[in-house]
Amino acid sequence: MKTIPLLFLLFIYFECDGKFIRHKDESFYECGQLIGYQQYCVDACQAHGSKEKGYCKGMAPFGLPGGCYCPKLPSNRVKMCFGALESKCA
């Protein structure tokens, strides 16, 4: 049972220099199957100031929200692009 927290800590360590942007219409479980989703991720991450190319990444094994992963952004947070936060998304 100690391996799960350790894996989670390693995951947090390696993902701490970016953030996720979730598509406002689709769940992250389906993002790899959507036509044009990879380009959406590239464009959305660029609009949020990412210096590197964004991509679709699921986090279902961790029970966490996922979607577009934007490397090396100034802040570490999950941004949900729907509901009350929709106006804050690119």
UniProtKB/Swiss-Prot annotation:
Its main location: secreted. Residues 1-18 form the signal peptide. Expressed by the venom gland. Keywords: Disulfide bond, Ion channel impairing toxin, Neurotoxin, Secreted, Signal, Toxin, Voltage-gated sodium channel impairing toxin. GO terms for molecular function: sodium channel inhibitor activity; toxin activity. One of its GO terms (cellular component) is extracellular space. It comes from the Eukaryota. Has the structural arrangement of an alpha-helix connected to antiparallel beta-sheets by disulfide bonds (CS-alpha/beta). Sodium channel (Nav) specific neurotoxin. Causes impairment of movement and mild paralysis in crickets at a dose of 0.5 ug per animal. A dose of 0.8 ug per cricket causes clear flaccid paralysis. A dose of 1.0 ug per cricket causes death within 2 hours. Is not toxic to mice at a dose of 100 ug per 20 g mouse weight. Belongs to the long (4 C-C) scorpion toxin superfamily. Sodium channel inhibitor family. This is Phaiodotoxin. It comes from Anuroctonus phaiodactylus.
